Amino acid sequence: MPEDAQREHSGARARTGQPSGVWWSIDPGEVHVGVAIWDGEQLGTASEMTPRELLGNVWDFQPMLIVIESFSLRSTRWTGAQSKQAVETLKLIGGVEALALMYGGRVVEQQPSVRHIAQRSPWWRELNVPANPHVRSAAAHGLYFLKFSKK
């Protein structure tokens, strides 16, 4: 499929309010990133990659919708290592948002807690998700977007 046609086909939302085409849900992290790739309401692939691989893939594939777990700095008692991890994760989220802005994609941030709602739902059992915790989190954020969010 030509690149322009593929981009046109992967619109962020259908008229029903549900995503159409290919879109991604992401669990960001300093070292490990979980990525779930959806085709409409069907989970396609789910895997783990590095932050650098994620940014390269976002630019290469330019998904028109990206659902990503948000991150906030809550504790003033973090160790130096935890603070570095927090900063790197925030930079990664900003990088994804900047890339999407450059090509016209839409980014939706979700609170980390919503993944638990998705994982307790009856729809979670229908998904074939690898045991990796980052990948499971990414898939849960996608499922939450599909079944519970107000888009």
Report each predicted region and the residues it spans.
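Phosphate- and other anionic-substrate recognition elements at nucleic-acid/protein interfaces
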Residues: M1-K151
